[in-house]
């Protein structure tokens, strides 16, 4: 799954569109599209995207023994 696909699935589930997500982030729709094309977001931006979608952002590592960090 690409970054664009992940964000677009979140947009669809939140029942908004790209322009509304951009507005909630304080970005222009053009900037959101550019960032979706590059697929490069900081952790803080991922947190903001999740908040704008009404979701929780989680990131971490799960090791073969089940340890999660």
State where each predicted segment sits.
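A short, Lys/Arg-rich alpha-helix, primarily the initiator
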Residues: 1-16
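Short C-terminal boundary/hinge segments that cap the last helix of small helical domains
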Residues: 54-69
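Short alpha-helical "recognition helix" segments of helix-turn-helix
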Residues: 20-22
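Recognition helix of helix-turn-helix/homeodomain-like DNA-binding domains
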Residues: 26-41
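Residues within the alpha-helical elements of helix-turn-helix
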Residues: 13, 24, 52
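Short, basic-rich loop-to-helix N-cap that marks the start of a DNA-contacting helix
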Residues: 38-51
